[in-house]
Amino acid sequence: MALLQISEPGLTAAPHQRRLAAGIDLGTTNSLVATVRSGKAQTLADEQLRDLLPSVVHYQQNNIDVGWNARDLAALDPVNTISSVKRMMGRSLADIVQRYPNLPYQFQPSENGLPMIQTASGLVNPVQVSADILKALAQRARAALEGELDGVVITVPAYFDDAQRQGTKDAARLAGLHVLRLLNEPTAAAIAYGLDSGQEGVIAVYDLGGGTFDISILRLSRGVFEVLATGGDSALGGDDFDHLLADWLREQAGIDSRDDHGVQRQLLDAAIAAKITLSDAEVADVSVAGWQGQITREQFESLIVSLVKRTLMACRRALKDAGVTADEVLEVVMVGGSTRVPLVREQVGQFFGRTPLTSIDPDKVVAIGAAIQADILVGNKPDSDMLLLDVIPLSLGLETMGGLVEKVIPRNTTIPVARAQEFTTFKDGQSAMTIHVLQGERELVQDCRSLARFALRGLPPLPAGGAHIRVTFQVDADGLLSVTAMEKSTGVEASIQVKPSYGLSDDEIANMIKDSMANAQSDIGARKLAEQQVEASRVLESLQGALAEDAALLSEQESTAIAQAMAALQQQMQGTDPHAIEAAIKALDAQTQDFAARRMDASIRRALAGHSVDEV
């Protein structure tokens, strides 16, 4: 007789009938893949039941190893073993060499300034290395799910910029994966905890992984996840703990490993093992390169306490941006393997005044959240229960006359978002316009970050102010920016997708925000001055054109008075007092009132010449 399958209410009895989707946590140190099976999110293990896949790739002449085997080969063949490639994603070669001068790899520049790494398999770039890691994760998912994936959600640090996000998408495509969405890592963790606990209120997500730190302040209310503010440091993580401890071990053992990458790898492995031991024990035994010794938890904590304090400074800035205090935070979610370090949990608990949440494995929580989101996006589950809102970290705008910045999308605006503003031409007969896209909080172009420039050509040759150009800024769910400019009367259009050639660190973002606050008053004054100077230039240029056409309408005395008022305005423009410039503009306007009226009369007479009253 036929067997009847029975499942729990709300769970699927036949998961193979669902569309196959996966969430991927593409980490700096380790990566994971997860999926939703029978209604529950779970990470997928390899044949040895290991959930984590080290984000390490070893390149040989005829073979590529990914994961644990590659990690084991790192000490023997460091030049051909690429690890922590996530730190290189979207960065220029010059930037990488400056940030990480001790990397053992043989770099070669490419035509676009991006890094290429010489290996036994040939030249590879960070996108290709990331693709090899994604291929291994995808293969694990296919084997576990017994089928091809319909789509994946891949997580990225909250402060990954456009180039880094695009590089991640390119790596996924190279791995043969369909990307449903890129998802911020802290937001993925919020999804995992929010769905499990139904918590409402303000939540802090403290994500300290191998190579990046992110802090996100979120508000969860009735299934809505809203990111109030983000912060962090894209060059700070557990890897830095490991390197500090490895340096300490080298000094204690009296080992000079600076030119021996194999010994350096052994020191690093010993440091990692000691760090893991010290999460549960007060003392760890260490044996490396013929040296044996011990390190206490107290000694380890003294090495890393300054780095932990740096993360708390970022937490303080994020709370200020969100407009909330630590007392208003209901729960603190801990994400990332480095949050297992007792000092981290202790310091974070003291800062927020409550014991952090660790009920979901901090190594797995991001992948689990990504899997839940992938399951929704692939169509297995209605998304009416949950709305996900991310934010952009810095304001986006464009340059206007006088070197001013007109903000189109303010900082911390929820994405995806589209905003448009209308602009016009400054000169008579202007047939082209340069659109200069900027990022930052300051009032002047020179103080903001330039993202891109493009030209809108073919404008109708109208008088100044006659053409109307609509500029639309659109940020998609992955944080990628598209800018489109269109002249309304002709439909002439130009657009660009912003992909910076290198990343912007969290420290730089924090400094840009801090500078905008520190210079707020002086920036407002500089903006007022520039605005009056632009208006003065417009008035003078317009008046000079009018005088060239109709100077005969003025008496000699009137011409002299106008010339003197123009000279006075030009003199004030050289100064720094916007009020004086404004007064000079008004004085010139008063001198030209009669002239303007006569020009209007003359224009009407010319228009009526040769026409009868009936025709009018």
Swiss-Prot record:
GO MF term list: ATP binding; ATP hydrolysis activity; ATP-dependent protein folding chaperone; unfolded protein binding
The entry's keywords: ATP-binding, Chaperone, Nucleotide-binding
CDD domains: ASKHA_NBD_HSP70_HscA (cd10236)
Gene3D superfamilies found in the cross-reference section: 1.20.1270.10, 3.30.420.40, Actin, Chain A, domain 4, Substrate Binding Domain Of DNAk, Chain A, domain 1
GO biological process, one term: iron-sulfur cluster assembly
Sequence similarity: Belongs to the heat shock protein 70 family.
PANTHER family associated with the record: HEAT SHOCK PROTEIN 70KDA
Function, as annotated: Chaperone involved in the maturation of iron-sulfur cluster-containing proteins. Has a low intrinsic ATPase activity which is markedly stimulated by HscB. Involved in the maturation of IscU.
Protein name: Chaperone protein HscA
Organism: Yersinia enterocolitica serotype O:8 / biotype 1B (strain NCTC 13174 / 8081)
Gene of this entry: hscA
